[in-house]
């Protein structure tokens, strides 16, 4: 019998992934990561629901204490990033360093299993020509989570199954109801678990970063107002600036040295290019010459065509056809060829 370890968060997606694989005849083992210290009530509730699902399906359930790993790789990563004036993307970092890698290691070393599954909406296939595992967008483009998975290694992809990649969210809800799973009507969770646990990113960050008043200035350096800490802002932000102006203003830069938030009108808020570093090439080998790709710079943004120009030190330059709004240092730029995720990295300016 095929054995698979399913990462269970206590939500409907991972519950259905486990139920479907169990129904297909797999020997399923549930695995839940205990991620957050202190106020992480979403995780404690999730662990209870995950345990209930495993009992309902009649499968074993393991809980792994990953709080120190999460603190080192995600909490500290976020805090240091916001202090430096960037807006880190914790989910891709978490998937590689906290979830998929450690889960695979635990499955192999403790459970004698070389495959894991999760409830992510994405697809994996092996390409015989390139001899690489390719990562593809989910059939349900509205739920596609491939953007957050760009940093997975070939080894991780080889050992991972995404049972939900070929179905819609509506299919998932229907299947959950058919199996009478406790999580069938559970509300959708936040994309970022830290926000769910703490109420807002501001509340979370204020526990770690001292609020330091500084100036909000325009592109010429004119002081327009005051802020209570640059970590409260992100590139492209319009609401909550507290600045009176004849036209809407947007955050275009955060300067940790001068402790300034720089703002501009929409016409001056776009950029024609950016640099991307810490690249991970997934479905293709790293290109040595410029290529044409579609690039997604935020999870909910549309992919836009760009010229990708390889640079030294595992970096590329992206040149946009038109100035792009909201290019944010610390976020991921993920490259696609249609439905195939080619690779991605972290945005620099």
UniProtKB/Swiss-Prot annotation:
Superkingdom field: Bacteria
Q: Which reaction does it catalyse?
A: S-sulfanyl-L-cysteinyl-[protein] + uridine(34) in tRNA + AH2 + ATP = 2-thiouridine(34) in tRNA + L-cysteinyl-[protein] + A + AMP + diphosphate + H(+)
E.C. no: 2.8.1.13
Query: Which controlled-vocabulary keywords does the entry list?
Result: ATP-binding, Cytoplasm, Disulfide bond, Nucleotide-binding, RNA-binding, Transferase, tRNA processing, tRNA-binding
Q: Mind telling me which GO cellular component terms the entry cites?
A: cytoplasm
Question: Which cysteines are disulphide-bonded?
Answer: 94-193
Subcellular location(s) of the protein:
Cytoplasm
Residues carrying the site annotation Interaction with tRNA: 120, 331
**UniProt-annotated stretches for the region Interaction with tRNA:** 143-145, 298-299
Q: What class of enzyme is it?
A: transferase
Q: Which Pfam families does this UniProt record tie to the protein?
A: tRNA_Me_trans, tRNA_Me_trans_C, tRNA_Me_trans_M
One example GO MF annotation: ATP binding
Q: A biological process (GO) annotation for this entry?
A: tRNA wobble position uridine thiolation
Protein family membership: Belongs to the MnmA/TRMU family.
Q: What does this protein do?
A: Catalyzes the 2-thiolation of uridine at the wobble position (U34) of tRNA, leading to the formation of s(2)U34.
Q: What is this protein called?
A: tRNA-specific 2-thiouridylase MnmA
Originating organism: Rippkaea orientalis (strain PCC 8801 / RF-1) (Cyanothece sp. (strain PCC 8801))
Q: What gene, per UniProt, encodes this protein?
A: mnmA
């Amino acid at each position: 019998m095929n054995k698979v370890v399913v990462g269970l968060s206590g939500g409907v997606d991972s519950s259905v992934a486990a139920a479907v694989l169990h129904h297909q005849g797999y020997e399923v083992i549930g695995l839940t990561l205990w991620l957050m210290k202190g106020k992480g009530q979403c995780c404690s509730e999730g662990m209870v629901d995950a345990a209930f699902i495993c009992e309902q399906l009649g499968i074993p359930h393991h809980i792994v204490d990953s709080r120190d790993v999460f603190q080192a790789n995600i909490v500290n990563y976020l805090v240091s990033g916001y202090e430096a004036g960037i807006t880190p993307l914790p989910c891709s970092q978490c998937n590689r360093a906290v979830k998929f890698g450690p889960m695979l290691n635990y499955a192999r070393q403790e459970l004698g299993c070389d495959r894991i599954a999760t409830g992510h909406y994405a697809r994996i296939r092996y390409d015989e020509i390139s001899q690489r595992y390719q990562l593809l967008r989910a059939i349900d483009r509205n739920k596609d989570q491939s953007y957050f998975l760009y940093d997975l290694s070939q080894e991780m992809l080889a050992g991972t199954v995404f049972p939900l990649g070929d179905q819609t969210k509506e299919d998932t809800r229907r299947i959950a109801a058919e199996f009478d799973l406790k999580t069938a009507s559970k509300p959708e969770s936040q994309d970022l678990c830290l926000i769910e646990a703490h109420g807002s990113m501001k509340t979370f960050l204020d526990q770690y970063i001292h609020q330091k008043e500084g100036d909000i200035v325009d592109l010429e350096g004119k002081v327009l107002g005051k802020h209570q800490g640059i970590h409260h802002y992100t590139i492209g932000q319009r609401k909550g600036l507290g600045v009176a102006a004849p036209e809407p203003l947007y955050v275009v830069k955060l300067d940790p040295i001068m402790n300034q938030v720089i703002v501009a009108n929409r016409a001056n808020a776009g950029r024609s290019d950016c640099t991307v570093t810490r690249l991970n090439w997934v479905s293709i080998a790293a290109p040595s010459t410029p290529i044409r790709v579609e690039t997604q710079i935020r999870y909910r943004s549309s992919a836009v065509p760009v010229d990708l120009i390889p640079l030294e030190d595992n970096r590329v330059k992206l040149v946009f056809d038109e100035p792009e709004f909201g290019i944010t240092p610390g976020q991921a730029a993920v490259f696609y060829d249609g439905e195939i995720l080619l690779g991605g990295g972290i945005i620099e300016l």
